[in-house]
């Protein structure tokens, strides 16, 4: 899994011009799945995201997790995180997970994370418009492939 984690003051996702979900302070996640992903990747990502300390404490140090600040998560599926750009000028997305597998993993990821932190989600495969107010900005890329190699 590849997940872009953005610390936000607020974020929302709209479909057909109507807001589907919105959150206040927390994380906006862009979640990509590949066919090689497994429950290991899913569990690793959930644990890392729930415990990642990138919110400022009273001393202005990044020392608090999304749980600590009682934040929320907006999760958006994004197969384009697996774009291959080595050849030509049009990206290939063949490395992205097959839709039926990716959707199941994405939904399981959201359900698992929601047991720890409030999670709202976009619609898998939909054309969505995402608005956010970055906080920092702080943007982190989590790639579970590295953890899988070292497991």
From Swiss-Prot:
A motif (Gly-cisPro motif, important for rejection of L-amino acids) lies at residues 136-137. Pfam families: Tyr_Deacylase. GO terms for molecular function: D-tyrosyl-tRNA(Tyr) deacylase activity; Gly-tRNA(Ala) deacylase activity; Ser(Gly)-tRNA(Ala) hydrolase activity; tRNA binding. It is an enzyme of class 3 (hydrolase). InterPro entries: Daa-tRNA_deacyls_DTD, DTD-like_sf. Its main location: cytoplasm. It comes from the Bacteria. It is found in: Cytoplasm. Keywords: Cytoplasm, Hydrolase, RNA-binding, tRNA-binding. It catalyses: glycyl-tRNA(Ala) + H2O = tRNA(Ala) + glycine + H(+); a D-aminoacyl-tRNA + H2O = a tRNA + a D-alpha-amino acid + H(+). Its EC number is 3.1.1.96. Transmembrane segments: none annotated. The keyword RNA-binding applies. GO terms for cellular component: cytoplasm. HAMAP family: Deacylase_Dtd. An aminoacyl-tRNA editing enzyme that deacylates mischarged D-aminoacyl-tRNAs. Also deacylates mischarged glycyl-tRNA(Ala), protecting cells against glycine mischarging by AlaRS. Acts via tRNA-based rather than protein-based catalysis; rejects L-amino acids rather than detecting D-amino acids in the active site. By recycling D-aminoacyl-tRNA to D-amino acids and free tRNA molecules, this enzyme counteracts the toxicity associated with the formation of D-aminoacyl-tRNA entities in vivo and helps enforce protein L-homochirality. NCBIfam families: D-aminoacyl-tRNA deacylase (TIGR00256). Belongs to the DTD family. Homodimer. This is D-aminoacyl-tRNA deacylase. It comes from Lactococcus lactis subsp. cremoris (strain SK11).
